[in-house]
């Protein structure tokens, strides 16, 4: 965790912390805690707002020192924007802005009072949970491979949250831990995070908690199961594949929810080699796997009363003389044959075998998560994941969960009219569907291996990582998936 969290019900003026975080709206209205500090300081905040030294506009942060009548040596005033438009997005932005303002510097402990604000259509528990997940996300620092590079160890370490809901805090912390677990895996370079490393890390976590268990299948076991599609992708790499299976037994005899995550630890594109301008970010092609493992972490930490199974096919798509080729015909675990039109459409080839494997758990619902297509990113950008399902009830559950925590998805069609684009003369199905509608035809391909399941597909290509060389893994959509499971456990 980037931060440690506690609950605090002290009066803001007397709280024993390095900094109190309060809010101000653009019309100079103060948040309740800010009003209390204004009263304790005999109108100091009101005076500063009146003369323009403190602003309430969105994105502004002003650090004040030594307010009279206030025990904390610092007060951070965060701009909340237009009071009439204040809602989910401005609330989450304000939390992130506050955390980033205190991330480095002399403030080690702070009291966040923004949780007392009224957020339309949300309750106090939501305020606390989201404050934890957003602030921890903003405070995250990647250090695993920095070597001798100096890391600034100063800055915020402990955040007290105004409120008294211990369960909301615990769920928020569990979700934040899951997000950070996923981000750390996603950010590791591919010479560190190999299929074996990914499997070992997931198994090590599961081994620490009663009710959690892990099974790691090696190449020989996958061969015995007939996973010819997955193993074809793995053929060109010295880093041999693993199938990661994690189980959380929190729901008695109930049928499990099953999450399948694409775990391509590096994607060269294979014989259809990727070009500069994209290949250097292909360590993030395992973020679907990282996300479902992170959701498993959140579920276990929150001790949700459900059964959950996570399946991650962990594979590197590399090139040598044994690598699979365009025009190869391979046989999947389902028995369906697949003509390879492009070796860079490998994610669906490992997922189809993992989805077939997942059927043995008799899922209540089956959801796969994958950085599957650039086409989804072209269609939807970096703001939302793409969602495909033939099951309206499941799709609506996932959409509602994402909307609730602002980790959103947008539904794309999965109509039968697209299926003909996958026809092959030489096999049961072609692994690409042509130039147009690439995200949808990828979903159609997967649908052929989930015909007997209540299934949905999340294409997270646009949301799994930030854009550019300074970007990092985001941990999305751990928030969406964890909320969906929380809703199922309610």
UniProtKB/Swiss-Prot annotation:
Top-level EC class as recorded in UniProt: hydrolase
Keywords in alphabetical order: Aminopeptidase, Cytoplasm, Hydrolase, Manganese, Metal-binding, Protease
Cofactor binding comment, as recorded: Binds 2 manganese ions per subunit.
A cellular component term, taken from the record's GO annotations: cytoplasm
Molecular function, one GO term: metalloaminopeptidase activity
Obligatory cofactor(s): Mn(2+)
Reactions accelerated catalytically: Release of an N-terminal amino acid, Xaa-|-Yaa-, in which Xaa is preferably Leu, but may be other amino acids including Pro although not Arg or Lys, and Yaa may be Pro. Amino acid amides and methyl esters are also readily hydrolyzed, but rates on arylamides are exceedingly low; Release of an N-terminal amino acid, preferentially leucine, but not glutamic or aspartic acids
Location(s) in or outside the cell: Cytoplasm
Keyword Hydrolase tagged: yes
SUPFAM superfamilies according to UniProt: Macro domain-like, Zn-dependent exopeptidases
Sites where the protein binds Mn(2+) 2: 262, 267, 285, 346
Residues bound to Mn(2+) 1: 267, 344, 346
Catalytic center residues: 274, 348
Listed GO biological process terms: proteolysis
Pfam families linked to this entry: Peptidase_M17, Peptidase_M17_N
Family membership: Belongs to the peptidase M17 family.
Role according to the record: Presumably involved in the processing and regular turnover of intracellular proteins. Catalyzes the removal of unsubstituted N-terminal amino acids from various peptides.
Protein name, UniProt field: Probable cytosol aminopeptidase
Protein species of origin: Xanthomonas oryzae pv. oryzae (strain KACC10331 / KXO85)
Taxonomic path: Bacteria, Pseudomonadati, Pseudomonadota, Gammaproteobacteria, Lysobacterales
């Amino acid at each position: 965790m980037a931060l440690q969290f506690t609950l605090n019900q002290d009066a803001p003026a007397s709280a024993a912390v390095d900094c109190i975080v309060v809010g101000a709206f653009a019309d100079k209205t103060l948040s309740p805690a800010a009003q209390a500090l204004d009263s304790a300081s005999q109108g100091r905040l009101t005076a500063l707002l009146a003369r323009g030294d403190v602003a309430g506009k969105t994105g502004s942060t002003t650090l004040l020192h030594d307010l009279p009548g206030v025990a904390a040596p610092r007060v951070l005033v965060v701009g909340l924007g237009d009071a009439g438009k204040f809602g989910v997005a401005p609330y989450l932005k304000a939390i992130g802005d506050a955390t980033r303002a205190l991330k480095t510097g002399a403030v080690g402990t702070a009291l966040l009072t923004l949780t007392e604000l009224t957020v339309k259509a949300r309750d106090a528990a939501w305020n606390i949970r989201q404050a934890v997940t957003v602030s921890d996300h903003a405070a995250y620092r990647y250090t695993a491979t920095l070597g001798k590079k100096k890391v600034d160890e100063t800055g915020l370490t402990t955040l007290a949250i105004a409120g008294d809901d211990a369960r909301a805090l615990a769920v928020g912390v569990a979700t934040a831990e899951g997000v950070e677990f996923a981000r750390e895996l996603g950010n590791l370079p591919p010479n560190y995070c190999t299929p074996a490393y990914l499997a070992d890390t997931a198994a090590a976590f599961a081994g620490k908690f009663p009710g959690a268990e892990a099974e790691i299948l090696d190449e020989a076991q996958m061969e015995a199961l007939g996973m010819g599609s997955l193993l074809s992708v793995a053929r060109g790499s010295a880093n041999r594949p693993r199938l990661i299976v994690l189980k959380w037994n929190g729901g008695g005899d109930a049928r499990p929810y099953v999450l399948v995550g694409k775990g391509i630890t590096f994607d060269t594109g294979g014989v259809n080699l990727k070009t500069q301008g994209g290949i250097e970010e292909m360590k993030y092609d395992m973020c679907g796997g990282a996300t479902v493992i992170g959701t498993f972490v959140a579920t276990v930490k929150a001790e949700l009363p459900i059964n959950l199974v996570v399946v991650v096919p962990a594979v590197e798509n590399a090139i040598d003389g044994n690598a699979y080729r365009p025009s190869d015909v391979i046989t999947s675990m389902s028995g369906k044959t697949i003509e390879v039109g492009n070796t860079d459409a490998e994610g669906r080839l490992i997922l189809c075998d993992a989805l077939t494997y997942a059927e043995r758990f008799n899922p209540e619902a089956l959801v796969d998560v994958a950085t599957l297509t650039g086409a989804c990113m072209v269609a939807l950008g970096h703001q939302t994941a793409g969602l495909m399902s033939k099951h309206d009830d499941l799709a609506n559950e996932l959409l509602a969960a994402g909307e609730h925590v602002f980790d959103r998805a947008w539904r794309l069609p999965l109509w039968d009219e697209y299926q003909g684009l996958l026809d092959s003369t030489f096999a049961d199905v072609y692994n690409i569907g042509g130039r147009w509608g690439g995200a949808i035809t990828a979903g159609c391909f997967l649908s052929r291996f989930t015909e007997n399941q209540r299934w949905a597909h999340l294409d997270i290509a646009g949301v799994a990582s930030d854009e550019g060389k300074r970007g990092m893994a985001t941990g999305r959509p751990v928030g969406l998936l964890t909320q969906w499971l929380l809703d199922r456990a309610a």
